[in-house]
């Protein structure tokens, strides 16, 4: 099955009846809804500069992204907060405010877009992968034992004030580090034998807490 194979309402109804029968029972009008709301493309906007004279882009107009991290509205709210802070800092000198704003937020707009695309590939290719799920379990255990030394990428993005650009860079660094550990140790058997904590203490007890710069 693929979206491009669903040409008619009957195709849609047949697909959901066969593949998702429980869903079809709850929403038997899915064929009509499919026709009323056709598929549309998703876009990312990357541009710079964001300001000209007394006008500045903000939110989606500056850094629209795909929805795979659920952070689009939040990033817009962050823009508003930072713009307000800059208004106070620069005493409403709009030329200075806009220049400072776009310089500060452009890397984070790009960072959110990189995160969103990365999470799309994760959801598409890895959420049912046993090794990926084991890695997430391992990361959560590390974070529980050493929260000041290891914060999973999703937590950095969704439950902190860490800049998107910093979270993305740190997340990729952490991913490579954890993959290296897992390549050299049988993490699955360590969980089963309850020895995984010993390995975590061995690796992380002497590591310095990392500095994650917030907005």
Region locations from a protein language model:
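FAD-binding beta-loop-beta segment adjacent to the flavin cofactor pocket
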Residues: 40-57, 110, 132
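Glycine-rich phosphate/pyrophosphate-binding beta-alpha loops
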Residues: 41-46, 62-74, 107, 120
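Hydrophobic/aromatic residues within well-ordered alpha-helical segments
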Residues: 12, 16, 79, 105-108
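Conserved FAD/dinucleotide-binding core of flavoprotein oxidoreductases
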Residues: 1-43, 90-92
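Active-site flanking residues adjacent to catalytic metal/cofactor-binding acidic residues
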Residues: 58-60, 78
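C-terminal helical "tail/cap" subdomain of flavin- and related membrane-associated enzymes
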Residues: 85-215
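A short alpha/beta connector and helix-capping loop motif
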Residues: 69-86
